[in-house]
Amino acid sequence: MTATPLHWSDTAHEVLSGDLNVAVAYVTPAGGAVVVSVSPLGLTDRAAGRIGFTTSLGFPRKLERILRDPRVALAYHTREHGFARPEDYVLAQGDAVVDMRPSPQRLDDVLDASDRFFGPGKSGRAWDWLLHEYRRARVYVDIDVRRMATWPDLAAYGPPEVTGPAWPDAPAEQRAPENGTAPRVDVARLSRKIDPLPYRLLAYRGADGYPVVVPVEIVGRDHTGFRLLSPPGLLPPGGRRAGLLAHSFRPQNVGLAMMTFTGWLTARSETEACYAPHTSTALAAPPNRTVQALGNGILAKHGVWRAGRDGTGERLRTLAGQQGPLGRRES
């Protein structure tokens, strides 16, 4: 953990401990950012200045990128179906440490937290076998929080209250990719898929290397991409690689739907931008808790089997063994 743990407010702590679904962003080797949704289950250690979430070996690319560059950000952007009451938008930036082999006690703690947020888990001989990898082959991602920014409303308008290092200046404009900045996927088709997903967040790499995640509205589209609106002061000028997330979820996280994009962001003003998507990935869970649990179990079993067969698990464990005290890889 950090030498001097960051201490955050009671309001922020309620949000960190109570949100059902948050956005997690990590940086890419090309200087962009990817943003996805996770359920952190209120995993916080306030005294240590640490937050976290768990994930599966079934998502190795996310883990590998975090292991190679541990600078991450978590955006607590909605109170829907959670336990927190404040209407603050909270952005936590920090350094991740990946625990590839959590202790049995840590895994038991996750199960207890899961019961609180997702409802009592399935049990019985068949379910225990099916969900073994989903429950016991988890990977812990701990984040030592370096900076926390809090806005007084979920739309993130106005100046933030910053705990930790001062908010950095806007990052420099990036060089356009060799293949150009225009959309590489069907914008009209993707727009129709995004329409039912109410939560939209944009992520880019900040000037100090940590991801910045901001809420945006998608207010239109044309041949150049999606037209975005953002609160004043949160869009960096110029063009750059960026990630976009659109997602939705129901109580106990049933029926989770998520679309993630990588692409090129061009700011047109302090509040308006064009986002040209280059890649897209979709995930949708069935709106039935039993069917979703069945799918989780099958996917986790397959992910663990595949990670063992193709060497992914060993490669990730090797990278994890090279982590420094703040997640930095040791040379």
Where are the model-predicted features located?
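A short, hydrophobic beta-strand micro-motif
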Residues: 69-74, 241-244
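Short amphipathic alpha-helical segments and helix-helix/interface helices
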Residues: 12-13, 63, 131, 191
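Short, solvent-exposed aromatic-acidic interface loops
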Residues: 55-60, 279-283
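Charged, gly/pro-rich active-site loop segments
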Residues: 2-6, 83-189, 229-331
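Short loop/turn motifs at secondary-structure junctions and domain boundaries
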Residues: 14-19, 192-197
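N-terminal leader/targeting segments and the immediate start of mature chains
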Residues: 1-2, 9-13
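Short beta-strand segments
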Residues: 20-58, 74-78, 84, 88, ...
